[in-house]
């Protein structure tokens, strides 16, 4: 017995196949829990993806939807429609941060188009932006555009991408790690560059703010991490080998709450530094390349090019490892309540409780 082909539409079928493949090959580069962080029960978080979108999801809604779906380690996961979505960038959105800790915070994102864009979080969360609208109907409140370098005869360089951001609301600053091997300090009020940090020989992967010492730290493809003085723009210390033959890119870094300890992801290793002593006190080997790292008080969380979330103590002892749904994980986001959201290849986000159980696993619908 054969099906009825009278209503067959080849164009619609082709479009549906392409859409399905696009969703399955999307990458989540960053997840971020929304303020106010003081709320003990986490709910709202934002997902930045390779299709340039920012999607806002409600954890409570996702958990109720996934109750009947179950946990999947493969690509067969629940597809969830976000509460709100906006196309933030032309090209991938690489990072998302909240500037401020209350409902008046700014939602900031950066991406491959060399721009930082910002929205009022309250307006973003309450906006009526339809998932099915192709155009961006929620205009950014803030837009910072990377400078282009002028060459011979006035020719401008391509727009360098922005791979990561860090925020310092105390000084009114946003720091960006760019593809032109420079880091930039932006004034949020004026939208102007306050300082340019030059010294790396290759593009930057990451930047973190150390506000207690008026410093930033950057990690680069050139295999080094650098500490910079925000008052002078000068590099005060270079961390890591400068030997081009043995260097491995510094892909991620994080500071602890005291801003005395720094952990760097470099190749298949974590390097733990005591900053006041300027000493690397621990090197922790990892089976796969590190792609994100963060502190949870006196412990280190890390993910990489494998479907595992690992937790270490400061002595390098492995405390736990939890299997997660993305086959390659690019992002960890920790809520103060202990809930972790990881995102990665396939556009998959896996939300894990403080006890190690999977609260929900999903793929966000796209524009």
From Swiss-Prot:
Xref: PROSITE patterns: WD_REPEATS_1 (PS00678), WD_REPEATS_2 (PS50082), WD_REPEATS_REGION (PS50294)
Any idea which GO molecular function terms this record carries?
Answer: RNA binding
List the GO terms this entry assigns under cellular component, sorted alphabetically.
Answer: Cul4-RING E3 ubiquitin ligase complex; mitochondrion; nucleus; THO complex
Q: Does the keyword Transmembrane apply?
A: no
Q: In which pathway does it act?
A: Protein modification; protein ubiquitination
Q: What happens when the gene is disrupted?
A: Increased sensitivity to abscisic acid (ABA) and salt.
Q: Where this protein primarily resides, as one coarse class?
A: nucleus
**What are the UniProt keywords, alphabetically?**
Abscisic acid signaling pathway, mRNA processing, mRNA splicing, mRNA transport, Nucleus, Repeat, RNA-binding, Transport, Ubl conjugation pathway, WD repeat
Describe where the WD repeats fall, as residue ranges on this chain.
Answer: 23-67, 88-129, 157-196, 199-240, 243-283, 285-322, 324-363
Q: Which GO terms describe its biological process?
A: abscisic acid-activated signaling pathway; mRNA processing; mRNA transport; negative regulation of abscisic acid-activated signaling pathway; protein ubiquitination; regulatory ncRNA-mediated gene silencing; RNA splicing; ta-siRNA processing
Cite the Pfam families for this sequence: WD40
Q: Which residues form a coiled coil?
A: none
Q: Which family does it belong to?
A: Belongs to the WD repeat THOC6 family.
- Entry function: Acts as a component of the THO subcomplex of the TREX complex which is thought to couple mRNA transcription, processing and nuclear export. Component of the CUL4-RBX1-DDB1-DWA1/DWA2 E3 ubiquitin-protein ligase complex that acts as a negative regulator in abscisic acid (ABA) signaling. May function as the substrate recognition module within this complex leading to ABI5 degradation. Functionally redundant with DWA2.
Quaternary organization: Component of the THO complex, which is composed of THO1, THO2, THO3, THO5, THO6 and THO7. Interacts with ABI5, DDB1A and DWA2.
Q: State what protein this is by name.
A: THO complex subunit 6
Its source organism is: Arabidopsis thaliana
Gene name in the database record: THO6
